[in-house]
Amino acid sequence: MRKVAVIGVGNSKFGIRNDVTISELAFEAVKPSFEDAGIGAKDVEFVALGSVGAGAWYEELLPAVVTSEYCGLTKAVLVRCEAACASGSAAFFTAYAAIASGHAEVAMALGAEKMREIDSSTSMEWIGRAGYYFWEFHNFGLTFPAYYALYANAHMAKYGTTEEDLALVSVKNHKYGAMNPIAQLKNRITVDDVLASMVIASPLKLYDCCPMTDGAASIVLASEEKVKELKVDTPVWVAGIGYSSGTANLSKRPDFVGLEASVLASQRAYKAAGVTPNQIDFAEVHDCFTIAEIMAYEDIGLCAKGEGAKLVREGQTEIGGKIPVNMDGGLKSKGHPIGTTGCSMIYELTKQLREEAVEKSRQVPLKNYVGLAHNVGGTGHYCYVTILKR
């Protein structure tokens, strides 16, 4: 397998973007990624698009074709990737594999999603189907917050995690999201704000839940030979990728205090990259709900099982702590345009590893120059863990 590097990144403004079409939104990310990489559309041989809501949340049913043509990517081979909320990471892996296997020299992973063109109740119904539709949604009416409320209650019962612990995750992520110019939610909040917010699915409250978001992110990758040819100043190398899947039916899961797919994907990523959790300088984890971030700490080995709440309680996941997590605000504050999130995580990893965080107060200190992105699809139905190294 050939070495592959990230050479260019771009990210649109996240939020309610009814001012643009899906193609225009994608272009907001693609254009700066070209400029960052020092290439043009004609140089890209392969495009993998992560997008979930085609024909449901937004109007286009063939978004890879439509967005690529709008962005001038007329010579590239196209594919759309779907892995629920991990679709962006699936697209990144697919673009990486195209280069690593010798099928392309330059490829793009593009995430583009519009979730706010339809009303909230319809959107929530579609998201609620992100499991086993017949057994869980159709029969029991589980919404997506209700799925993660099951995990939150189980984690509390087994490990003593509290609602205040969950609130601390939200407070941290809003703190850093307020510093991020592309973030959807820029308001700083307190633990009391979280605890006083409306109950969505007990114990999860409004401020425990990520927003529904429109947004796009673009990642340009290149082979080692192309990196040398282009004389890229600061390539960020793909050190390892691990991936795994979980059972469709939640009743077949071993427990509700973590995601087995996250454990397996992280183990495979560490092995592929030849690093240990202690060598990770910072991480982006899938905090669709506050409990998801705490479980992620444990699942990917940042702490022992049952100690995730302690990690955030002690401030260890903030800048200056043991392992900074979600310094862009995470899904909770930056936003969660489902098919885009994985690529947006890679955008943040790349910016941090190049020491280019737009707001310097959220630039993480780097020792090993290694960052990790953990991206979950569904309730652990898919998981990708990507490790980048400068």
Regions found by a protein language model. Name each.
Residues M1-S23, W135, A167-L168, V199-L264, ...:
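Condensing-enzyme catalytic core mediating Claisen C-C bond formation in acyl metabolism
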Residues I7, S33, V44-V47, G88, ...:
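Buried hydrophobic positions in well-ordered alpha/beta secondary-structure cores of metabolic enzymes
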Residues V20-F27, W57-L61, S89, L142-A149, ...:
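Electropositive phosphate-/nucleotide-binding environments in soluble metabolic enzymes
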Residues A54-L62, L250-D255, D287-K310, P337-G339, ...:
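Short glycine/threonine-rich loop-to-helix capping motif typified by GTGT followed
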Residues A54-V106, K114-Y147, L185-P211, S244-G246, ...:
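Conserved catalytic cysteine-centered active-site region
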